[in-house]
Amino acid sequence: MKHFFKSLTLAIALAASVLFWSPQAQAYPFYAQQGYESPREATGRIVCANCHLAAKPIQVEVPQAVTPDSVFEAVVKIPYDTSVQQVLGDGSKGGLNVGAVLMLPEGFKIAPPDRLPEELQAKTSGIYYQPYSDDQQNIILVGPLPGEQYQEIVFPILAPNPGTDKSIHFGKYAVHAGGNRGRGQVYPNGEKSNNNVFTAPIAGTITSITPNPDGSTAVVITPENGEAVTETVPAGPELIVREGQTVVAGAALTNNPNVGGFGQKDTEIVLQDPNRIKWLLVFFAAITLSQILLVLKKKQVEKVQAAEMSF
């Protein structure tokens, strides 16, 4: 039943995306859910990079330390030039969308709405947070979102409590974040999107370039020996070749229309034991008191010595 509702959620999200976004390889972090048990490979690479081939920087901000059962915010920043437009699925130009994945330590999860302060409610308004799976609530997906409004994605996080969950322990943990702006270059099935460079499948001479009614272009390449091969270039990428031109296998037939990219960043967070902080404060207080007593004792000794010298 859980798997049914998960599939239903994905279907609704995809349907909404089709209604409100042009059909294209959007910044859909949930594509990874369908093909990967974990969004992070053994090498440390986040699987979103398999479809978003260009590398772009991101930033992630989390508190240095948090206490059990506390609510805090984690921020994934996805900067880019908002004046730039990307190629949409129909070949037209439009704004970039963004998406993010946040991999937290075990036990951390999205905070329930009734635990959010007003300021955090305002920062997270309009954002839908989705766990990677039913048993991986600590891995959170967001997107696609319009990049003009969400270059900073705020995650409201609830820290676990080792006092009530014995599987959780105090200590330092790794946090992994990934974020992308713009469409992917490859679909999950391995097929190129129209946000990619199209290349010559064989070496030969371009004998014809014919526009198709759907906006795509048929490029026919004839080798010296053998049959001609047709490469269909979808609407969007711009052709950089002409009829009669000789090309080698793998040569670019179009420009690279991609203006986006994916990035990932690692950081750390400490689940701090409040009792440890209390004992640390007691220790500092004891040290301070000892120093004060030593100073007072020293002054007392100096007074006695001064009194003895006066006789």
From Swiss-Prot:
Leader sequence segment: 1-27
Subcellular location: Cellular thylakoid membrane
SUPFAM superfamilies in UniProt: Cytochrome f subunit of the cytochrome b6f complex, transmembrane anchor, Cytochrome f, large domain, Rudiment single hybrid motif
GO molecular function per UniProt: electron transfer activity; heme binding; iron ion binding
Pfam families in the record: Apocytochr_F_C, Apocytochr_F_N
Role according to the record: Component of the cytochrome b6-f complex, which mediates electron transfer between photosystem II (PSII) and photosystem I (PSI), cyclic electron flow around PSI, and state transitions.
Name this protein carries in UniProt: Cytochrome f
Main location: membrane
